[in-house]
Amino acid sequence: MNGDGAREGDSVSHEPSTSKSPKEGEETKKEEKSEEKANTVPFYKLFAFADSSDVLLMICGSIGAIGNGMSLPFMTLLFGDLIDSFGKNQNNKDIVDVVSKVCLKFVYLGLGTLGAAFLQVACWMITGERQAARIRSTYLKTILRQDIGFFDVETNTGEVVGRMSGDTVLIQDAMGEKVGKFIQLVSTFVGGFVLAFIKGWLLTLVMLTSIPLLAMAGAAMALIVTRASSRGQAAYAKAATVVEQTIGSIRTVASFTGEKQAINSYKKFITSAYKSSIQQGFSTGLGLGVMFFVFFSSYALAIWFGGKMILEKGYTGGAVINVIIIVVAGSMSLGQTSPCVTAFAAGQAAAYKMFETIKRKPLIDAYDVNGKVLEDIRGDIELKDVHFSYPARPDEEIFDGFSLFIPSGATAALVGESGSGKSTVISLIERFYDPKSGAVLIDGVNLKEFQLKWIRSKIGLVSQEPVLFSSSIMENIAYGKENATVEEIKAATELANAAKFIDKLPQGLDTMVGEHGTQLSGGQKQRIAIARAILKDPRILLLDEATSALDAESERVVQEALDRVMVNRTTVIVAHRLSTVRNADMIAVIHRGKMVEKGSHSELLKDSEGAYSQLIRLQEINKDVKTSELSSGSSFRNSNLKKSMEGTSSVGNSSRHHSLNVLGLTTGLDLGSHSQRAGQDETGTASQEPLPKVSLTRIAALNKPEIPVLLLGTVAAAINGAIFPLFGILISRVIEAFFKPAHELKRDSRFWAIIFVALGVTSLIVSPTQMYLFAVAGGKLIRRIRSMCFEKAVHMEVAWFDEPQNSSGTMGARLSADATLIRALVGDALSLAVQNVASAASGLIIAFTASWELALIILVMLPLIGINGFVQVKFMKGFSADAKSKYEEASQVANDAVGSIRTVASFCAEEKVMQMYKKQCEGPIKDGIKQGFISGLGFGFSFFILFCVYATSFYAGARLVEDGKTTFNNVFQVFFALTMAAIGISQSSTFAPDSSKAKVAAASIFAIIDRKSKIDSSDETGTVLENVKGDIELRHLSFTYPARPDIQIFRDLCLTIRAGKTVALVGESGSGKSTVISLLQRFYDPDSGHITLDGVELKKLQLKWLRQQMGLVGQEPVLFNDTIRANIAYGKGSEEAATESEIIAAAELANAHKFISSIQQGYDTVVGERGIQLSGGQKQRVAIARAIVKEPKILLLDEATSALDAESERVVQDALDRVMVNRTTIVVAHRLSTIKNADVIAVVKNGVIAEKGTHETLIKIEGGVYASLVQLHMTASN
């Protein structure tokens, strides 16, 4: 809401957002990028936000993880006992007895592991959830305390929401259950080696030589992965900005048929994100391959060396195997840490930017409690020799030694042309910025010496673009004062003349206002903003074009309200309109950052050559109504009016806001008060009905083009899966060899060693292949889903975006987080599933060939393992669904607050926003904690069952050996084959959490992809007229906004507009004037009745073509964060479509060429987010040029000149007059000067056309609506 300051950009604006030339800018960006690549936070810093209970949870979780990790080495010891029991008692009657004792120990171990595993998972998941929540709110809190300059230069709303929804998930992943898993695996590793040294140190030492190699491979991999993932994040952040801009300005996009362009630029950015995800996949695979290669080779070494030890050092075969197995189990667990390491790396990269922001000390700190707090202030304001330039454009001086004194209780008005620096004065008094040198004093004390929060609480700001938050009217007003009572709020609405219209709304004070206050008309929003300022009871009142957005009737009443409020307060007014200014105690005329004149209205008029007199004369030219005085007032007023409106826009120029508002002022009103509610209750079904389940086949079908890639990947995964069970056979063969005579032992140990190396080489080839192929398939799928979903969303009818669950913040979160999750369902999940199936299958085959009876017995028990896995998946699923959308609501709170940071700052509402945010987060956090408990139980239980299965199988084996049905060797072959298979299977269950989240994500994405747009701009069918005359007819229209079905806008509206004529629509704020424009553009369709163009029903015409015939200039122009040239060319559909000469011709017509050429980079100036770097008047002229480039047959002007001061307004009006020739033009306006020359004036009242005719005829109707509107203007300006 860069309203004030940057708007003041007027002057400011002459500079692009950075002072470097574009080329240099790109280079520095590249340098920054390269630095950014490797930026990470040291791991322990991720836990900087843990409190004492978190520390306790982490300690318990770590103890559990260590216990759980140690269970494996202990199991191998028991296993050594088993080999001995079997070996020594093969032919013994005691075998069952001896073995069953060992088996019982297995059961005890299982029980211990159950407890440890529960602690590990539950504690880590819960603490991860808690800390992530704390990081989110700390981040939001620091974002809110930053100085306004930070938002001008370093960040934007899209980025903040992206970090809060996307990056915190990565951080939570890195500090939650993954840490527990990591500790578990590491303790298996360490514990294993300690036991191995006890059993046989020499052999262990030999095997240890491979560890450094393993570690190096792992480290290299982590490094590469981190790099690739931060590169991917950077690319995706750019794509997110495209989403935010497009959906936030959907009406502008639709009107200029810019959907194609948005889709193309989105695709460009997601393709670069795709490339880095492939790199990431390949490097992970390569790392794993190298690790396994080293691992199997070290095995080969151990077997050859172990054979040597048996011959030379008298080791027993059992001891050698024991050492080898322990070392294997230990090192294997090290290999399994890779997903954890990847997650840590991604979390550290994500945390870097967030923590940098959290650490940033703002230059102007709202939370700083130091500084003076006085009993009260008188309210003298002085600017002393102030030098200032906006942080976004440091080389452009706004003030160069500016001074101004306003005594307490006085009303000072600042006038001057657009861009002279008027609003900058207000930004400095609010201390949004500090001057470079010089001082701003209140009661003679430098503003910097006061406690910021306290001094802001003494200042009330009503700006030209009031920003409201997505909550109820009551909550919006309550921002003015902490703990305000309902009585105080009601009194404030009375004073601000808002009580009447609020009472009419179905829910009264509890009516929800939409994103950026879209559900209300401009005048209504302004009155709520005034009520909010009144509630504060400020000593100093700052009015930045406060009444400009109102029509004559409301403006008069609001002005009276303001006059009442201004009594005994120091008031600073920025205005174009003289009527507002004349009664001020002092008028200061500002020109290019200098005060050229000051005095009262009458004093300044005495100097007929003075700047003030010239401004007044300018306004009179625009008018020839009765007396010059009157006229001047009224036109000024209007102009002002306008300004404000325009202003409005920049605030949050979400286009949605924009449009609605524009769309009719009131529509405004009518439009939305419900919408949010609706979003939740009536239309709300959308948010409440569970989304239909998406079948996996449907998602898989999207991956169709990658079938060859997936097939190859599957083959690789299958080979990879078979490696471990094969490994099991080899071990049992080796055990056999170790008990053979010396010469055979020597020969066999060499042979098996070579086989092991071969196994390693296979792994080295297969692993990277598998990862790379699945990364390609998964990456392409994500890219395809993102572009499908975005493409579909962009073509939705405008009404769809009025629902809160489709706001720009929510859509951004859907596209970034959900699409990534879906990949887990197809690519990653498939690769893992195939690998596990292969492990299981090969394990079973090997087991059955060895001893079918034993294999069958074990097989019967396998479902136990399966059931437990299933239970775990089921539990994970239950909770992830709502948690995600709940966080979406919370991120909407953040989106609102960051988008309106000036309002939050001036009302010291940071605490309030934080409370709302925390309230929205409570539910999801509770769910996360519940999920932790249940997952912990499931996880622990799976271990217990596993150990019981082992105990039973060995007991059964002992029985079979006793009965002579199998040999001790085969028992081990069955055991190893199945253990290895089980390890594979248990790995797959670790992926359970992702699949449940992914299904929910898929449902939310497919809900968009499957929805039929009611008014689809991508639909190429429909008639296209050869040549358009421009006759428009509206017959018997009735209309209500879909979001507020209970408020009727049009009842039975009829209006005929002849080709080439100009029709002006007038009426009160909220009568539905702008709605006519929305309907002509087919943003909405009427509920009944017909609209025709040249006799053809609009619905029968091709939508895209229809919109290309119309040029819209709204009261709040939406510009994109791109160059001026690109913004103008947007009218043509793309920068390539418009030639340089067309662009310049359009700019000249719109009277914009002069100011564009005077900026350093001319047409290559970047206008900033929502056009912030330009002043209101400049934005408007660029918007007019954009409409002109289209060469439209029909021109729609919705308060188009309202935001301009007298000088620019005259010139733009001339431009418009030139453009309007021979075009059908529809003008919505408050200001008489604009309306008088129209061929037909239509007065809209109560949903119908009450009067129509020319100015001359209508003015003569005694007591007519038009005549009384004109009369109002006159008196108001008097």
From Swiss-Prot:
It catalyses: (indol-3-yl)acetate(in) + ATP + H2O = (indol-3-yl)acetate(out) + ADP + phosphate + H(+). The keyword Protein biosynthesis does not apply. Disruption phenotype: Slight defects in primary root elongation. Increased incidence of root waving and skewing in response to mechanical perturbation and directional light. Reduced pistils length in the abcb1 abcb11 abcb19 triple mutant compared to the double mutant abcb1 abcb19. This is ABC transporter B family member 11. The gene is ABCB11. Belongs to the ABC transporter superfamily. ABCB family. Multidrug resistance exporter (TC 3.A.1.201) subfamily. Glycans are attached at residues 483, 568, 653, 806, 1121, 1222. InterPro entries: AAA+_ATPase, ABC1_TM_dom, ABC1_TM_sf, ABC_transporter-like_ATP-bd, ABC_transporter-like_CS, P-loop_NTPase, Type_1_exporter. Present in roots and flower buds. GO terms for cellular component: extracellular region; plasma membrane; plasmodesma. Residues 1-13, 21-35 have a biased composition (Basic and acidic residues). Keywords: ATP-binding, Glycoprotein, Membrane, Nucleotide-binding, Repeat, Transmembrane, Transmembrane helix, Transport. It comes from Arabidopsis thaliana (Mouse-ear cress). It comes from the Eukaryota. Its main location: membrane. Coiled coil: none annotated. It is found in: Membrane.
